[in-house]
Amino acid sequence: MQQRGLAIVALAVCAALHASEAILPIASSCCTEVSHHISRRLLERVNMCRIQRADGDCDLAAVILHVKRRRICVSPHNHTVKQWMKVQAAKKNGKGNVCHRKKHHGKRNSNRAHQGKHETYGHKTPY
């Protein structure tokens, strides 16, 4: 009889954990700080970029630049980055966005009782 009770409790715990996964946020890779300075020389080596919005999934607006195997988070208000994005858009003849918006993989808990661990990609550039 005790084994049957333990099995029922274990099953209930598994069901509760499975249901709570839909409520808890999926850990995302948001920038937690941004660099306000970036060199034009570094911008020449950018492979791709993404735009991170401060929309509830991430707390900070940023432009994420991918340089080799690094991600560099830069302020979207940075004048040098804005100019670079205009030049890149002109090179593409205005077709499509230079930097794509970051895709979100789920909704966050509205009361933010549990927050996923954010990865820090905010690098201060030595340039």
Swiss-Prot record:
Q: Which cysteines are cross-linked by disulfides?
A: 30-58, 31-73
Provide the leader sequence positions.
1-19
* Matches recorded under PROSITE patterns: SMALL_CYTOKINES_CC
Q: What is its main location?
A: secreted
Biased composition (Basic residues) is annotated at 92-115
Q: Does the keyword RNA-binding apply?
A: no
Give the CC-aspect GO terms.
extracellular exosome; extracellular region; extracellular space
Please list where the region (Disordered) is annotated: 92-127
Q: Its GO biological process terms?
A: antimicrobial humoral immune response mediated by antimicrobial peptide; cell chemotaxis; cellular response to lipopolysaccharide; chemotaxis; inflammatory response; negative regulation of leukocyte tethering or rolling; neutrophil chemotaxis; positive regulation of cell-matrix adhesion
Instruction: Enumerate the subcellular locations listed in this protein's record, separating them with semicolons.
Output: Secreted
Q: Where are the transmembrane segments?
A: none
Identify its protein family. Answer: Belongs to the intercrine beta (chemokine CC) family.
Database matches in PANTHER family: C-C MOTIF CHEMOKINE 28 (PTHR12015:SF205), SMALL INDUCIBLE CYTOKINE A (PTHR12015)
What is the role of the protein in this entry? Chemotactic activity for resting CD4, CD8 T-cells and eosinophils. Binds to CCR3 and CCR10 and induces calcium mobilization in a dose-dependent manner.
For this entry, the protein name equals C-C motif chemokine 28
> Which source organism does the UniProt entry give?
Homo sapiens
